[in-house]
Amino acid sequence: MADDTLSGIYNYRPVDQAIGTSGQPSVAQFAEVAAAGFTTVINLALHDDPRYSLPDEPGTVQSLGMDYVHIPVQFAAPMEADLLAFFTAMQAHEGEKIWVHCAANMRVSAFLGLYRVIRQGWDKERAFELMNGLWQPNERWSSFIATMLAKYGQG
């Protein structure tokens, strides 16, 4: 079963049939992601730290037949423009199997929660279950989330 294979990926969390999330996968794990039928990878991590990135992640992902979208989000300073780029990427690949990752699934879980509330109309408690099961946002992230929810009418 795909979930058994994918469960070895750091902080892997299946969201539903169309979305999987995790921390940074290895090259071999990206092959498992492709084999599980995912067609798009959205990366919210940076490429400047070898502990949390692959040397040629775009090439690796594309060589496996998946689309690759990179939205580098500074963990210490998430930006509204990053969130809006994420919304655009999610909507552009709607109906596909999407794998979203960052270094530890923290950025992803926060952005996905915001996406679910702001763009899909979910209630906040349900939308942020993934995030709350992984981590408790620090002051910077809590403020960012609250600001985005307030700005887009869900605060």
PLM-predicted stretches and their roles:
Residues 1-99, 110-155:
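Cys-dependent protein tyrosine phosphatase-like superfamily
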